[in-house]
From Swiss-Prot:
InterPro entries associated with the record: MTUS1/CCDC69
One cellular-component annotation, GO: extracellular space
Disease: Hepatocellular carcinoma: A primary malignant neoplasm of epithelial liver cells. The major risk factors for HCC are chronic hepatitis B virus (HBV) infection, chronic hepatitis C virus (HCV) infection, prolonged dietary aflatoxin exposure, alcoholic cirrhosis, and cirrhosis due to other causes.
Coiled-coil annotated residue ranges, if any: 940-1231
Described purpose of this protein according to its UniProt entry: Cooperates with AGTR2 to inhibit ERK2 activation and cell proliferation. May be required for AGTR2 cell surface expression. Together with PTPN6, induces UBE2V2 expression upon angiotensin-II stimulation. Isoform 1 inhibits breast cancer cell proliferation, delays the progression of mitosis by prolonging metaphase and reduces tumor growth.
Subcellular location: Mitochondrion; Golgi apparatus; Cell membrane; Nucleus
Bias-annotated ranges (Low complexity): 38-50, 197-211
Basic and acidic residues bias locations: 212-228
Polar residues biased stretches: 533-556, 701-710, 759-776, 797-815, 1244-1270
One BP annotation, GO: regulation of macrophage chemotaxis
Gene source species: Homo sapiens
Protein name, as recorded: Microtubule-associated tumor suppressor 1
């Protein structure tokens, strides 16, 4: 009770605490008014390092339709590689979608981006720890691991703060417990971004992830599709106001509304496979495949602009995040947006995106959605509903461990009251510009009612698919989403199990506390807790469970809350009273259920039992429960529990018990009549519990179911439906989701994949098988419930109450069926689990305790976390002890006693189990209440401390203001004085200037006169001096002329004398030369005469000789003539002579030729010698060449060998580098987790298990390069 009150108070306080306008300005704001709250965004910053410390920053951004963002950094939260990859994938898809969305609603993007991006992503990241991780390494590796245990955890944590944004997004704090498990799952795919961007309430989307909401949506999917289509129209009408992702908000919002429902639901399964509208269809085309892949993103962004709008918000948020987290946040935001969109759609009318979902989602879902069923039948049905309604459940189912499903209901949250509802200002697109005040065209209560109805319908549908797995349209769409999520979640679940590995505080103390409380009080408190949270949650269909509960508990109070949060806080304070009042206002049935949750369960059960019996009969007659039967059952339940039916989660809870009972009854009939009786008792108890839980289990159980708490409600409903005979399905899913809690994360992973396969092959058997694997270890069911709780962390109210209610229901159910059923479940997983129902209940109990522990770990604010741990641990210990004893007793009883006694013993055991379950539930509720109260106390203390600081600052500032005013007065007087002095100085200055001018003129005149006189004086003196100098120069010139004349005469006289001397010397030398010349002439003439005489003699001699020769010539000529005459007489002789001469010429020619030939021969000989030498050299070179070739061959062989060796070494090096990179990445991740807080450290064991899973990949990848070396 205190926890719920604290939640509501915190919601109110937070809402009032911060409000952010479109511009992103934060101001104190009381989000009582639903319209503003719609756009309000709340951020909860939880330091993972200090789980006890929780800072809740509540920001209401009317402009920003994206919901509140909760930043939760929990030590318990563990980030996984899958989460990272999931976020990456989301980032890519969401970024793309964001881009589209941004274009559609840039104002929204701009507004929300800076503010919410960090909050949403950071909150989820902080909450999940994975979100934080994504911000670091997380940046969400695209498509790598969309399903991440970390995400689930983060979602759970977020859901822990699942502020039921009834009026304000503040409810996230109140929904600590619920939001925890489901929020985690939701967050798994889009927790951070979707949260914020989607439906203004990141937390909301996380909460919505709960299986309750999924279930409700599932059922609603069938008939709400029309509603959803109508909401599509409504969004266009109130698009700016209500549908963030609606046609008006988004350009293609109208189509988007239905698509959002479907695709948000599917989106978890296939991130973008469902983009109906063209704007996001291309994204769908791209991401649809990815989504079909386990897309943790969760919400598949419908083609419609609305989804894009959500993504836009998500994108904005992610954009505002600076680091890798931004990408992660984009993804997360995308997820959140998608989830939010789906949730919003669900929440609005929860028209359940069913129409679009069935259209596109169904196609994809058939192939892979079965896998989701494999993961958990309940999960599958949830997934179906969720797929139809919102992929949150699927995210929880598929990727509850690591997948962040929260984003789906993020949008819903924003709507406060089904923010998604057409009335809500969920305008994520352009409508963001319009003030959020206008957003709430429909009252939060109406929106909540719509959402609840839709969720109820969805829940029914979801349950129907679970039990039936036949409704192809609903089941397949949800399955598709679930399948994708399941595929991803299998790994994520294992990791999620790691989240449960938190150190548990002393259980004894918690037990003592729980024991001190009255049983009914805790339940009422839990119900009230759950109810307030559901109310808040009902504000947003993502937190459909919480919002539904809110609506169920106080639809009118919701409007009251919107009108006056303070009144709501007061109501919360008087938790039981208000809860009763709320129930009264909403429905007397709801009040009765919440008050008489434990005792009234049988009463309600009787009414519901008949319906459930009918449903069970129908299910027994038809293994796949027909949608009609399920709907009929829901209608009956609605008649029995009108309020419950209004609150979708109540319907879901009721319907789930029916389905559970159906499958258990079937198996009970198969096994024995006793099992049938037990099942009937269980059904009665479960009906009561579910009716009772519908309020607080409605949201919580839905959240739990959606987030992966298939054991509590999901197990009861979805698991029991599909795996009721094989009750182990629920536990395995929970275990898988809570692999962080489980000791065998890898085993759980293995189980979850198997389960997924089985689900794809056959919904129930697969889920049962998975449950069996999970059931092998009872602690795992606890982890699973913990995981479930984690996933509804934001929907903490729903999750914890749902745990309590589910626990009580399951306890009742298990009590009816008997402890032997638990043993049977363990021994015979398929039948015993839900046959007896005790095992299911029992299983839920451990899960609940662990879920509580996990919720306590994750959601508690401040010391409340430790208390939660202690309480949950104590509960779990007692639960574990009880289960063992129960198991032992059933085994011994049937052996020792006859059948009748065995039946009696089983009945007594079932009663004991019911009582113990109620006790455990009450303890859990007490622990949850304590935790919530402590969280509220921490928040209040924080707010009070801040208020005191603000008051101190106000005082100091006021004093400073007074001082400044005094100083201002003094300064003003001083300024006036200075002004006067300045004026005086100005006048003096002007007078001085005039005087100066006058003096200047006078002095100039005087100076002119003075200088003129001086000038004249100087001129006269200058003239006088010039004349003097002229006279002096003239005298000097005359003197110089006289001296020159005298020197000239002297020089002329000396020159004449010299000339005479020279003439005499010349004449003497000339006479001498003439004499010498004459002598030489005479000698030469003598020589000439002599030579002439000698030459004449020679001439005479030669003439005589010439004559003699002439004579000889004549005689010779005569002789020749004579010979010629003789030759003429002998011609032969002449011929011979000629021949002789010719022969001589020929001989000469021949000789020349021979000489040339000799020369040539010499040359040839030389060439031959040279040739032989060259030949020898050639041979030598050839031999050398051959040797070199041989050596070259050897070298080539060696080089080839070396190259091959080098390639092998290079491959080995690459492998080692890859291994080193992986190890380094894992090491960084582990270090980051260690750095983020102790909560993540317990999850290391699952992380270690994840490492071995990756090592096989490395080992497998290594051989491939070795096989084909480069």
């Amino acid at each position: 009770m205190t926890d719920d009150n604290s939640d509501d108070k915190i919601e109110d306080e937070l809402q009032t605490f911060f409000t952010s306008d479109k511009d992103g300005n934060t101001h104190a704001y009381n989000p009582k008014s639903p319209p503003t709250q719609n756009s309000s965004a709340s951020s909860v910053n939880w330091n993972s390092a200090n789980p006890d410390d929780m800072v809740v920053d509540y920001e209401t951004d009317p402009a920003v339709v994206t919901g509140e963002n909760i930043s939760l950094s929990l030590q318990g939260v563990e980030v996984f590689g899958h989460e990272k990859s999931s976020s990456d994938f989301i980032s890519k898809q969401v970024l793309d979608m964001h881009k589209d969305s941004i274009c559609q609603c840039p104002a929204l993007v701009g507004t929300e981006k800076p503010k919410y991006l960090q909050h949403s992503c950071h909150s989820l990241e902080a909450v999940e720890g994975q979100s934080v991780e994504p911000s670091l390494p997380f940046v969400w590796k695209p498509n790598d691991n969309l399903n991440c245990a970390g995400y689930c955890d983060a979602l759970e944590l977020n859901q822990t703060f699942d502020m039921t944004v009834d009026k304000v997004n503040c409810t996230f704090i109140s929904h600590h417990a619920i939001g925890k498990s489901q929020s985690f799952h939701t967050a798994g795919s889009l927790p951070p971004t979707g949260r914020r961007s989607g439906s203004t309430s990141s937390l909301s989307y996380s909460t919505w992830t709960s299986s309750h909401s999924d279930k409700t949506h599932a059922r609603e999917t069938t008939y709400d599709r029309e509603s959803f289509e109508n909401p599509q129209v409504t969004p266009s009408e109130a698009q700016d106001m209500t549908y963030t992702a609606f046609s008006d908000v988004v350009m293609q919002s109208e189509v988007f509304v239905s698509d959002i429902g479907n695709q948000c639901a599917c989106s978890s399964g296939k991130v973008t496979s469902e983009y109906t509208d063209g704007s996001q269809q291309r994204l769908v085309g791209e991401k649809e495949t990815q989504a079909l892949t386990p897309v943790s993103d969760g919400m598949e962004v419908p083609n419609d602009s609305a989804l894009q709008e959500f993504f836009c918000l998500s994108h904005d948020e992610s954009n505002s995040e600076p680091h890798s987290q931004s990408s992660y946040r984009h993804k997360e935001m995308g997820q959140n947006l998608r989830e939010t969109v789906s949730y919003c759609l669900i929440d609005d009318e929860c028209p359940l995106m069913v129409p679009a979902f069935d259209k596109s989602e169904a196609q994809v879902l058939n192939p892979e959605h079965k896998v989701t069923e494999t993961e958990d039948t309940q999960m599958v049905s949830k997934g179906k509903d969720l797929g139809t309604q919102n992929h949150t459940s699927e995210l929880i189912l598929s990727s509850p461990p690591g997948q962040k499903v929260g984003s789906s209901f993020g949008l819903t949250w924003d709507a406060n009251d089904m923010v998604i509802s057409t009335d809500k200002t969920m305008c994520m697109s352009t409508p963001v510009l319009e003030p959020t005040k206008v957003t709430f065209s429909v009252s939060p209560i109406e929106a909540t009612e719509k959402c609840k109805k839709v969720e109820k319908g969805n829940r029914g549908l979801k349950n129907i698919p679970d039990s039936k797995e036949a409704p192809v349209n609903l089941c397949k769409p949800s399955l598709g989403k679930s399948t994708i999520k399941t595929n991803t979640p299998i790994g994520c679940k294992v990791r999620k199990t790691e989240i449960i590995s938190y150190p548990r505080p002393n259980f004894k103390n918690v037990k003592a506390k729980v024991m001190s409380r009255a049983v009914l009080q805790p339940k009422d408190a839990a119900l009230s807790k759950v109810t307030p949270r559901p109310q808040q949650t009902s504000a947003s269909s993502p937190s459909s469970v919480n919002s539904r509960q809110q609506t169920v508990l106080s639809r009118t109070p919701r409007s009251d809350l919107n009108a006056d949060k303070k009144a709501e806080i007061l109501i919360n304070k008087t938790h039981k009273q208000q809860f009763n009042k709320l129930i009264t206002s909403q429905a007397v049935h709801v009040t009765t259920h919440s008050k008489n949750a434990s005792h009234r369960v049988p009463r309600t059960t009787s009414a519901v039992k008949s319906n459930q019996e009918d449903v069970d009969k129908a299910s027994s007659s038809n293994s796949a429960c027909e949608t009609g039967s399920v709907s009929a059952l829901f209608q009956k339940i609605k008649g029995i529990l009108p309020v419950k039916m209004e609150s979708a989660e109540c319907l879901e809870m009721t319907y789930v018990p029916n389905i559970d009972r159906i499958s258990p009854e079937k198996k009970g009939e198969k096994e024995n009549g006793t099992s049938m009786e037990k099942q009937e008792l269980k059904q009665e108890i479960m009906n009561e519990t579910f009716e009772y839980g519908s309020l607080f289990l409605g949201s919580a159980s839905k959240t739990t179911t959606t987030s992966g708490r298939n054991i509590s409600k999901p197990d009861s409903c979805g698991l029991r439906q599909i795996a009721a005979p094989k009750a182990k399905v629920g536990p395995p899913v929970s275990c898988l989701r809570r692999n962080s809690d489980n000791r065998n994360p890898s085993a759980d992973r293995a189980v979850s994949p198997q389960r997924i396969r089985r689900v794809s092959s056959s919904g129930k058997p697969t889920s049962l098988k998975t449950a069996q694997s999970s059931w092998v270890n009872l602690p795992r069911p606890l982890p699973k419930s913990k995981a479930s709780l984690k996933s509804p962390a934001l929907r903490r109210t729903g999750s914890t109450p749902s745990i309590a209610s589910t626990h009580s229901e399951l306890s009742t159910y298990s009590n009816n069926s008997g402890n032997a059923a638990v043993i049977k479940y363990e021994e015979k997983p398929p039948k015993p689990a839900f046959q007896n129902g005790s095992s299911g209940s029992f299983y839920l109990k451990p899960l609940v305790s662990r879920a509580h522990v996990h919720l306590m770990k994750t959601p508690p604010k401040g010391p409340s976390r430790k208390n939660l741990f202690t309480a949950l641990n104590a509960v779990e210990k007692s639960r574990q002890k009880n289960p063992r004893s129960l198991c032992i007793q059933p085994q011994t009883a049937p052996d020792a006693l006859p059948p009748e006694k065995t039946l009696e013993l089983t009945q007594y055991k079932t009663k004991c189990e019911n009582q113990s379950g109620f006790i455990l539930q009450l303890k859990q509720l007490l622990a949850c209440g304590n935790t919530k109260f402590e969280a509220l106390t921490v928040v209040i203390q924080h707010l009070l401390s801040e208020r005191e600081e603000a008051l101190k600052q106000h005082k100091t500032l006021s004093q400073e203001l007074v001082n400044l005013r005094g100083e201002l007065v003094t300064a003003s007087t001083t300024c006036e004085k200075l002004e006067k002095a300045r004026n005086e100085l100005q006048t003096v200055y002007e007078a001085f200037v005039q005087q100066h001018q006058a003096e200047k003129t006078e002095r100039e005149n005087r100076l002119k006169e003075f200088y003129t006189r001086e000038y004249e004086k100087l001129r006269d003196t200058y003239i006088e001096e010039a004349e003097k100098y002229k006279m002096q120069l003239q005298e000097q010139f005359d003197n110089l002329n006289a001296a020159h004349e005298t020197s000239k005469l002297e020089i002329e006289a000396s020159h004449s004398e010299k000339l005479e001397l020279l003439k005499k010397a010349y004449e003497a030398s000339l006479s001498e030369i003439k004499k010498g010349h004459e002598i030489e002439k005479k000698s030469l003439e003598d020589l000439l005469s002599e030579k002439q005489e000698s030459l004449e003699k020679q001439i005479n001699d030669l003439k005589s000789e010439n004559d003699a020769l002439n004579e000889k010539l004549k005689s010779e000529e005569q002789k020749r003539r004579a010979r010629e005459k003789a030759n003429l007489k002998n011609p032969q002789i002449m011929y011979l002579e000629q021949e002789l001469e010719s022969l001589k010429a020929v001989l000469e020619i021949k000789n020349e030729k021979l000489h040339q030939q000799d020369i040539k021969l010499m040359k040839m000989e030389k060439l031959v010698d040279n040739n032989t030498a060259l030949v020898d050299k050639l041979k030598r070179f050839q031999q050398e060449n051959e040797e070199l070739k041989a050596r070259m061959d050897k070298h080539m062989a060696i080089s080839r060998q070396l190259s091959t060796e080098q390639a092998v070494l290079q491959e080995s090096l690459e492998k080692e580098s890859k291994v080193n990179k992986r190890l380094s990445m894992e090491n960084e991740e582990l270090l980051w987790k260690l750095h983020n807080g102790d909560l993540c450290s317990p999850k290391r064991s699952p992380t270690s298990s994840a490492i071995p899973l990756q090592s096989p990949r490395n080992s497998g990848s290594f051989p491939s390069p070795s096989i084909s070396p480069r």
